[in-house]
Design a protein with these regions (language model features):
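Alpha/beta catalytic cores of nucleotide-metabolism and tRNA/nucleoside-modifying enzymes
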Residues: 4, 40-64, 71, 146, ...
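Bateman/CBS regulatory modules and CBS-like beta-alpha motifs in cytosolic regions of diverse proteins
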Residues: 69-86, 92-94, 123-160, 168-170, ...
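Short beta->alpha transition motifs characteristic of CBS
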Residues: 115-120, 163, 167, 175-190, ...
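Active-site-adjacent beta->alpha loops and helix N-cap segments on the catalytic face
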Residues: 121-127, 241-252, 274, 293-311, ...
Length: 524
């Protein structure tokens, strides 16, 4: 838009100059010089300062569609070079948005959650394991307990691991029984041995059993847990009726090759990031996200190179950047996907504090020119308030969108519910906010005294806020997905890639935006 405007002013410039030189009586030379000076200034302005657009500045022009029903659309998309999602939604790696609860809920719907890094390595690994163990074709390395332990230990382990039963093994790691909460409910003697309370006649299956065969055994014997053992009766895995039911209940869930839910985890660019990456990958994290506010920096680029060198097969996402040049540098460093967005989040004040950033639609379009050439997926991160925003980001070139505030305040987001003036709220904060940074500093320097000067020197680029309690995130996910599907149908597209080929944007005025909202009525 800015270049067409400049060309227009340039044509006026030429016309005025020709008239002045030819002695036209339409205008006097002195008037021509004044107008030329003004036009020159406008040309310089439009050539040197490009225009930046965000979601509210544009609409997608509807086109002819052969889509009969939005159910015909397919939202399958690439998260990274080799990982696919069934819906293009990612929950943000923020400490008030994504831990295991959010990651499980989103993966079951077809997306993925990125576990935030603002915790110890052990705690972050535990969150990843919770997602991986939440459901699978067969639970590998199921939780076990020695038959010599007491009932109190069994209860504690079930509580800590959030499971309803444990496999019991002997000194040779052979299966000898199974103990469930049902076996020890109302047990008055907590010192009683597990071997005395467990069920000893355990129905088992051999390695290689199919799901259909497992369903038959579970039904025939009216049991809920089916241990899988080898020829020497060593425990290989565990198949549960709950997992099979979940497979049928969530047919579009995002899963790995072992049938476990997909989950990602964030790391930084300093300190323990290599150790953290290795431990998270060992725990089963499907993708690692290098998490830094200014991704177009030597710190981020060097971290990407180091991670890729140490773990070549790791699926690696990095960001955040706001330009095509930033995306190109990260891709050349070795990333498998680029995360785009600087200052677009609802609790981010980077643009206000630093004066830096690019409006999100422009940032996505500029980055898409590069990521498309390299065939690398791009994630639009920040500013998603509605399904329409998500649709625009995808149409502009993103393969998926990362969501923060929209998922905040839900049952699955971390943190306690706050009641204020009779209304329910949950905390939501930017990871560059003062208290988030203070908490991070305490964790990183727990053995050292934090000087007040260190805190005074810190300039927050995020804020803390309360958001209305919203209930389950599943309802929000399905509303957003439904809106995106409708957006595809308005573009005459069955897939996200088709929409990107078909989509044409139109810039709107503030009046056009107002017209897009409910108006001249009292909304009930």
């Amino acid at each position: 838009m800015q270049y067409k405007t400049a060309e227009f002013f340039s044509s006026i410039h030429t016309s005025i100059l020709e008239n002045a030189l030819s002695g036209s009586h339409l205008i006097k030379n002195i008037e021509a010089k004044l107008i030329i000076s003004i036009v020159d200034t406008l040309i310089r302005y439009y050539l040197e300062i490009p225009e930046g657009l965000t979601f509210d500045d544009v609409l997608i022009i509807p086109t002819r569609s052969h889509i009969i029903s939005r159910s015909q659309t397919d939202l399958r998309t690439r998260l990274s070079r080799n990982i696919f999602l069934n819906i293009p939604l990612i929950s943000a790696n923020m400490d008030t948005i994504t831990e295991s609860g959010m990651a499980i809920a989103l993966a079951r719907e077809g997306g993925i959650g990125i576990i935030h890094r603002f915790m110890t390595i052990a705690d972050q690994v535990d969150e990843v394991l919770r997602v991986k163990r939440s459901e699978s074709v067969m639970i590998e390395q199921p939780y076990t307990i020695s038959r010599k332990m007491n009932v109190a230990a069994a209860v504690q382990m079930m509580t800590d691991r959030e499971v309803s039963g444990l496999l019991v093994e002997d000194e040779d790691n052979k299966l000898v029984g199974i103990i469930t909460r049902r076996d020890i409910t109302f047990e008055s003697n907590s010192e009683k041995k597990v071997s005395e309370s467990m069920s000893k006649d355990v129905i088992t299956a051999r390695q290689g059993i199919t799901i259909e065969e497992a369903k038959e055994i579970l039904h025939k014997h009216r049991i809920e847990k089916l241990p899988v053992v080898d020829t020497k009766y060593h425990i290989v895995g565990l198949i549960t009726s709950k997992d099979i039911i979940k497979m049928e209940q969530y047919p579009y869930a995002s899963k790995d090759k072992k049938g476990r839910l997909l989950v990602g985890a964030a790391v930084g660019v300093k300190g323990d990031f290599l150790e953290r990456t290795e431990t998270l990958l060992d725990a089963g994290a499907d993708v690692i996200v290098v998490d830094i506010a200014h991704g177009h920096s030597d710190n981020a680029i060097n971290a990407v190179k180091m991670i890729k060198k140490a773990f070549p097969s790791c699926e690696l996402i990095a960001g955040n950047v706001a330009t095509g040049d930033g995306s190109k540098d990260l891709i050349q460093a070795g990333v498998d996907a680029v995360k785009v967005g600087v200052g677009s989040g609802s609790i981010c004040i980077t643009r206000v504090i630093t004066g830096s950033g690019v409006p999100q639609i422009t940032a996505v379009i500029d980055s898409a020119k590069v990521t498309r050439d390299y065939n690398i997926p791009m994630i639009s991160d920040g500013g998603i308030r509605t399904s329409g925003d998500a649709t625009k980001a995808l149409a502009a070139g993103a393969s998926s969108v990362m969501v923060g505030s929209l998922f905040g305040g839900t049952d699955e987001s971390p943190g306690k519910t706050i009641v204020k003036n009779g209304k329910k709220f949950k905390m939501y904060r930017g990871m560059a906010s003062f208290y988030a940074s203070l908490g991070r500093k305490y964790r990183e320097e727990s053995s050292q005294l934090i000087e007040s000067d260190d805190l005074n020197d810190y300039v927050p680029e995020g804020v803390e806020a309360m958001v209305n309690y919203k209930g389950s995130v599943v309802d929000i996910i399905r509303q957003v997905v439904g809106g995106i599907r409708s957006g595809l149908s308005y573009c005459g597209a069955k897939t996200v890639i088709e929409m990107q080929k078909n989509a044409k944007f139109i810039k709107i005025t503030s009046a056009g935006y107002t017209e897009s909202l409910p108006h001249d009525v009292d909304v009930v």
